[in-house]
Amino acid sequence: MQQKVLSALEFHKVKEQVIGHAASSLGKEMLLELKPSASIDEIKKQLDEVDEASDIIRLRGQAPFGGLVDIRGALRRAEIGSVLSPSEFTEISGLLYAVKQMKHFITQMAEDGVDIPLIHQHAEQLITLSDLERDINSCIDDHGEVLDHASETLRGIRTQLRTLESRVRDRLESMLRSSSASKMLSDTIVTIRNDRFVIPVKQEYRSSYGGIVHDTSSSGATLFIEPQAIVDMNNSLQQAKVKEKQEIERILRVLTEKTAEYTEELFLDLQVLQTLDFIFAKARYAKAVKATKPIMNDTGFIRLKKARHPLLPPDQVVANDIELGRDFSTIVITGPNTGGKTVTLKTLGLLTLMAQSGLHIPADEGSEAAVFEHVFADIGDEQSIEQSLSTFSSHMVNIVGILEQVNENSLVLFDELGAGTDPQEGAALAMSILDDVHRTNARVLATTHYPELKAYGYNREGVMNASVEFDIETLSPTYKLLIGVPGRSNAFEISKRLGLPDHIIGQAKSEMTAEHNEVDTMIASLEQSKKRAEEELSETESIRKEAEKLHKELQQQIIELNSKKDKMLEEAEQQAAEKVKAAMKEAEDIIHELRTIKEEHKSFKDHELINAKKRLEGAMPAFEKSKKPEKPKTQKRDFKPGDEVKVLTFGQKGTLLEKTGGNEWNVQIGILKMKVKEKDLEFIKSAPEPKKEKMITAVKGKDYHVSLELDLRGERYENALSRVEKYLDDAVLAGYPRVSIIHGKGTGALRKGVQDLLKNHRSVKSSRFGEAGEGGSGVTVVELK
């Protein structure tokens, strides 16, 4: 892309605006190199990156760029062995923190389901160096000072320094407090000169003080003297400071060597963060100018919806629809000067450059932009009627260069084509130049104020006339582009509104040819028709958007209602499960009481059995149905005791015990017995053989209540198998469909013994080892008949 074209379209000013949104000097540096690309794949990727960054800004506000500084100089110095300063290590630590924060921030958003694959891909390249960050932070604080605990040696030296400084100050302050010394001192303070502690002594008392003069006041009236009594103490202090400096140098050298080991990773982190800053700056700019992602193509088709020039004040800029490259490849905008033609031309050119640079463009959603190999522009300040030959020549030199390079993958912009010479010759040249460029199938937008070009679009296939609307009422252009309507001067209307007498205007019109007047009338009619059509289209579009908004609101309400319904069902099911669990616990407690009574050889009394039965029946909760029960799938039939049924209100299987009269049955569900209405029962299968004694045994005979698991670990072989026999019988009586036997892995002897017993047991339907989550081969899961 030619630099003079970028300058003519003021692309550098757009770059300056984008640079203002960068978070670091690194991002600004990268944006300074921003330029249009001719690779559609690269452009689409950059636009998608900006789109993802815009989503992040919309959802989270900003990405964390704090700590991102340019440390490349420090890293290069570390590579060659130069010792880095504490402040440089503070910057490196800040960068390491920024890397950690950015990686976590973007990774968390991706894990939360935000669709940012390209940004996430950048973040995955970041390398967190926690060890290096910890080493630096343990030695240097946020202000670039080496900490006392950076080493034990440094801690000891600084303790010594503080002690020595305290002694020197105490000695000097005692001198200052001396009554004999007060008249000889300019001030009663201890100060420092040449890194040594001194006191201010008046010039006339110099001989009364032994010691070393380190400085004199500007007036010469005060001498800053180090008394002889503290010279040795100051010397000791200086020696300690030298040791401190040497130890700090050693610590910094060690840190530099550690940093040098990771310069490759740090350079990569810098590059990734620089790229992210580059992307997010473009996204922040897009938000500031209300830009959208254009749809890119390589077919030369442009359709900009409500396009706005990004450098004009938002409250003054006029949005325009611009379409080029499908039904016509050339647009010629005609009309008078100062009508806004150049702004329209620059808007098209600048938005094309922005899109090809991976920037979102100030236009409405759904706008399309094309990728061009070349963008040519001949734009100058041609707003004066008087044009010099030199101006015409310079434009013609530029046009000749364009004609030599233009091809079908070019966008060509001509501003006031043919201006600067005789109007008739200029118009003829303009048409000839347009014909030549049009034959290459390039995309062309040209502006001119020559009336001869009004008919150009009607006589050429693939060429469309256009103009910029002029408001007769306000005597000013509206800057609204009218494609399909050629421009007209409006000179008569303007003159009339400004007070020119009617007879002069009438005489002027008579001087015009009938053909010219007819053309002007036709153009005026076209303008009115187009305006009405646009108003109707705008109204239709408004109705469509309102309908879409209503549709989305209804969809959202449906989603919310479904979500609320699902939540209510889930809560109801959870409450039901909790009630069943509580009922099971109550039943277990009751059976445990009966078992205890039996083991203590107590005889059952009638009232104890009656109370236990009532408690068992009352243990089953009365559910508040949060949803309608299932309807029976089969036709109504005659139930009989022993039938296996499904209790629809609870979704559980059970066995019919006896009919209690009317339409109710006593149903056994596991260890629970309850009354259920016949309409809430669904037949599954008939009873194989009635076992009348089963319920009696369950309460009065066999002690059948057991846990769902039998733990045999630590048991002797024979005792363990005996327990398995008893446990299986009890589990069958308890109505359990499935139990687990924990035998452990060990030598495998107990496991094999259990497996052999289960194969031949009358109540075992099947058995298997537990899954990974059930205990693996250390557990056998038994299905009971």
UniProtKB/Swiss-Prot annotation:
Record's note on what induces expression: Constitutively transcribed in rich and minimal media, highest transcripts occur in stationary phase in minimal media. In rich medium protein is expressed at a constant level during all growth stages (at protein level). Probably part of the polX-mutS2-yshE operon.
InterPro entries reported for this sequence: DNA_mismatch_repair_MutS_C (IPR000432), DNA_mismatch_repair_MutS_core (IPR007696), DNA_mismatch_repair_MutS_sf (IPR036187), MSSS (IPR046893), MutS (IPR045076), MutS2 (IPR005747), P-loop_NTPase (IPR027417), Smr_dom (IPR002625)
KO phenotype (gene knockout): Not essential, it can be deleted. No change in spontaneous mutation rate; does not genetically interact with mutS or mutL. About 10-fold increased sensitivity to mitomycin C (MMC). Decreased transformation efficiency of both chromosomal (5-fold decrease) and plasmid DNA; a double mutS2-recU deletion strain has a 57-fold decrease in chromosomal DNA transformation efficicency. Hypersensitive to antibiotics that target the ribosome; erythromycin, chloramphencicol and tetracycline, but not to beta-lactam antibiotics.
Highest taxon above the source species: Bacteria
GO CC, alphabetical: cytoplasm
Region (Partially complements a deletion for mitomycin C (MMC) resistance and for chromosomal DNA transformation): 636-785
Keywords carried by this UniProt record: ATP-binding, Coiled coil, Cytoplasm, DNA-binding, Hydrolase, Nucleotide-binding, RNA-binding, rRNA-binding
Protein's GO biological process: mismatch repair; negative regulation of DNA recombination; rescue of stalled ribosome
Binding site for ATP: 335-342
GO MF terms, alphabetically ordered: ATP binding; ATP hydrolysis activity; ATP-dependent DNA damage sensor activity; double-stranded DNA binding; mismatched DNA binding; ribosomal large subunit binding; rRNA binding
Region ranges (KOW region): 641-681
Occurrences of domain Smr (ranges): 710-785
Protein EC: 3.6.4.-
Pfam families recorded: MSSS, MutS_V, Smr
SUPFAM superfamilies linked: DNA repair protein MutS, domain III, P-loop containing nucleoside triphosphate hydrolases, SMR domain-like
Coiled-coil region: 513-586
Miscellaneous: The ssrA gene (for tmRNA) encodes the SsrA tag added to nascent proteins in stalled ribosomes by trans-translation, which targets the nascent protein for degradation.
Function description: Acts as a ribosome collision sensor splitting the ribosome into its 2 subunits. Detects stalled/collided disomes (pairs of ribosomes where the leading ribosome is stalled and a second ribosome has collided with it) which it binds and splits, by an ATP-hydrolysis driven conformational change. Does not seem to have endoribonuclease activity (in the context of ribosome stalling).
Family to which this protein belongs: Belongs to the DNA mismatch repair MutS family. MutS2 subfamily.
Protein name in the entry: Putative endonuclease MutS2
Organism: Bacillus subtilis (strain 168)
